[in-house]
Amino acid sequence: MAEHNKFKDVCISAVLAAIYVLILVASTDLGSALIFFMIYLFMLFVSTRNIIYLFLGAGGLSGASVIAYHLFSHVQERFIAWRDPWSVIDNAGYQVAQSLFAMGTGLYEGSPKYIPVVTEDFIFSAIAEEFGGLFAMLLILVCFSCFIAFLKIAMEQANMFNKLVCVGLGVGYAVQVFLTIGGALKMIPSTGVTLPLVSSGGSSILSTLFVFAIMQGLAIVGTKVKRNVTRRIPTEGLVNEQRQTERIRQLERTGEIGKVGKKKKKKIK
């Protein structure tokens, strides 16, 4: 019965998540749809600890990608621009080609101003061009460190709801970073997603600040829980030691310990 109810809850949550994702797909915001789908998938895995859901999600994502390719013309354009930007450099591939030119030149020699929407979804190309590849790699390490910190905070949570919130926010942040940097490096098709706390945009920066604020609050909660646990363990040990010491003293007062010692000596003789 418990397994049946658990599977029923998974189905209900899957339907609600699918409705939300389909609304984003209908508004042609496929980048956000992918982010929220990955958030739901990993939260489902953490809550159920069933790896089958990850494989089912990967299969569903592959099927949805094929369907989106045939339904939306802009998805086809971005796929062609990702596969061979030089063949469509005058149209859909212009942004990707200019991004590669900027990063390939580097250190003030490129021209990031020629990249369309360079301050948003292709901000990583401008950073790599202006500050060099080393600075770009350091930026990636900073983003990766933030994700690891999110996972560490999630592991410190005793409450499952708090843990799921940490996992969801951490996965959303990581996927957003991967989509932005991966699109600029031509690893994946461009999705139009901004780089958290780096790209321009008031709503993007504000939402990311809310994410970090929530994570900071959950980190404080996790630290308090950890301190309470570490304090409780030695206290229990001290109480047991005190009780044993008091019991020994009582036996010494009544002479029980001495009698036991004398009996043992007689047996030895």
Could you describe each region identified by the protein language model?
Residues 53-139, 158-165:
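Hydrophobic, glycine- and aromatic-enriched re-entrant/interface helices and adjoining loop segments
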Residues 24, 65, 69, 142, ...:
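Alpha-helical transmembrane segments of multi-pass membrane proteins
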Residues 156-192, 198:
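Loop-to-helix entry and N-terminal half of a specific, functionally important transmembrane alpha helix
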Residues 5-26, 30-70:
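Hydrophobic alpha-helical segments of polytopic membrane proteins
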Residues 1-4, 41-50, 68, 141-157, ...:
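Structural signal for the C-terminal ends of transmembrane alpha-helices
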Residues 181-188, 193-269:
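A juxtamembrane structural motif centered on a specific transmembrane helix
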Residues 39-53, 115-135, 192-206:
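Interfacial segments of multi-pass membrane proteins
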Residues 20-27, 105-110, 128-129, 179, ...:
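Transmembrane alpha-helix interface/packing and boundary motifs in multi-pass membrane proteins
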